[in-house]
Every structure is written in structure tokens, then in C-alpha cells.
UniProtKB/Swiss-Prot annotation:
PANTHER family: APOLIPOPROTEIN A-II. Pfam families: ApoA-II. One of its GO terms (cellular component) is spherical high-density lipoprotein particle. GO terms for molecular function: cholesterol transfer activity; high-density lipoprotein particle binding; lipid binding. One of its GO terms (biological process) is positive regulation of phagocytosis. This is Apolipoprotein A-II. Residues 1-18 form the signal peptide. Gene3D superfamilies: 6.10.250.100. It comes from Ceratotherium simum. Keywords: Cleavage on pair of basic residues, HDL, Lipid transport, Secreted, Signal, Transport. It is found in: Secreted.
């Protein structure tokens, strides 16, 4: 009976130690995966900064913003005029009943 109890105790201890070792390995692999991911993201960010410094990209971005501004300016002016007309129609509605 004592032999059986000692055997069960040893098996339990070995099982617990094995699971502990597996957890430590999983944590280390997760940490290395995260550090590798952060390293890749950092390198990618550095590459983007270097590419953004090129004059060609800056010229393309400037041309894009100028083109967008040219297209949006008339739309914004029209929307402003429409809003003023809309609000003034409400003002006219309020003044009509007062004059009667």
C-alpha cells in the first residue's frame, strides 16, 4: 500500500513539474514572438520615415492636396450658400406671422 502511495505521489510531482516547464517554455516563446513583432514594426516604421523624406513623395502629396482643395472649395462655398438660404427661409417664416 505504501509503495502504491509513493508511486502515485511521484507521478503527481513529475506531472506538475512537466506542466510547469511547459508553461515556462510557452511564456518564453510568447515573449520572443512579441519582441520579434515589435522589432518588425519598428523596422517598418523606420522604412516609412525614410521613404517619406524623398522629394518625389512630398511633391506627390502636395499635388494631391492642391487638387483636393481645388475640387472641394466650390463644394464648400455652395454648401455655405445653401445653408444661408435655408436658414434665411426660416427667418422669413418667423417674420411673416408677426406682420399679420
Amino acid at each position: 500500500m505504501k509503495l502504491l502511495a509513493v508511486t502515485v505521489l511521484l507521478l503527481t510531482i513529475c506531472s506538475l513539474e512537466g506542466s510547469l516547464v511547459r508553461r515556462q517554455v510557452e511564456e518564453q516563446s510568447l515573449q520572443s514572438l512579441i519582441s520579434q513583432y515589435l522589432h518588425i514594426v519598428t523596422d517598418y516604421g523606420k522604412d516609412l520615415v525614410e521613404k517619406a523624406k524623398t522629394p518625389e513623395l512630398q511633391a506627390r502629396a502636395k499635388a494631391y492636396f492642391e487638387k483636393t482643395q481645388e475640387q472641394l472649395t466650390p463644394l464648400v462655398k455652395k454648401a455655405g450658400n445653401d445653408l444661408i438660404n435655408f436658414l434665411s427661409s426660416f427667418m422669413e417664416l418667423k417674420t411673416q406671422p408677426a406682420t399679420k
